[in-house]
Amino acid sequence: IALFPQARHPLLYYWWFEHSVPAALKKHKAELFLSPDGYLSLNTAVKQVAVMHDINFEHYPGDLPLLTSLYYRHNFPRFARKAERLATVSEFSKSDIVERYNVKPEKIDVVYNGVNELYKPLATDRIEQVRLKHTNGCPYFLFVGMLHRRKNIANLLRAFDTFKSNHDSNVKLLIVGHRKWWT
């Protein structure tokens, strides 16, 4: 079964995960609950697997609205302990979860982000069209991600500046992403 996403407000998280999710799991006699966002229900005996991409909110709690930060920091350690298994996207995040939440490393699987098979190399003429559109035909480095200070874009710009200073190159830097908590 697939459940519709819960509301994205911390006051509603509790109701969703402690009432709605357990009721749906019971109704459908589910054997496992997979949460791709890391949230779990503390109110069900059904086995659960959480995907915790990172726990950056532990290190930078001010990057989130106050209620969200409090909810995450209070509950994610509990979710990590409750989960039958955890998945995360890097060895760094795994180590962070192990150290911060005192979870055994054997409980955590590192599963790297995948790429849909629809994404494949472009034909040469299409590559040239893209270059002409975005960089007047120049080669480029591409950053795709949330535009947020925790994504370290300042160092990306410094690194690109260093590259340009050390190489006689017409390479451009393209930055693509959604402004999130922009300051």
Model-derived features: positions:
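Carbohydrate transferase catalytic cores enriched for Leloir-type hexosyltransferases
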Residues: 1-183
